[in-house]
Amino acid sequence: ANIQSFSFKNFNSPSFILQGDATVSSGKLQLP
């Protein structure tokens, strides 16, 4: 995905930090 480093503090209020491909891992998107 082109969405990049997501860090979900709250599934209702996600924090988005754009910066590279990411994969979903336990409520967090992490760069591979």
Swiss-Prot record:
SUPFAM superfamilies: Concanavalin A-like lectins/glucanases. Keywords: Calcium, Lectin, Mannose-binding. GO terms for molecular function: D-mannose binding. InterPro entries: ConA-like_dom_sf. Belongs to the leguminous lectin family. Metalloglycoprotein, containing Ca, Mg, Mn, and Zn and the carbohydrates galactose, glucosamine, mannose, and fucose. It agglutinates erythrocytes of blood group A1. Homotetramer. This is Lectin. It comes from Macrotyloma axillare (Perennial horse gram).
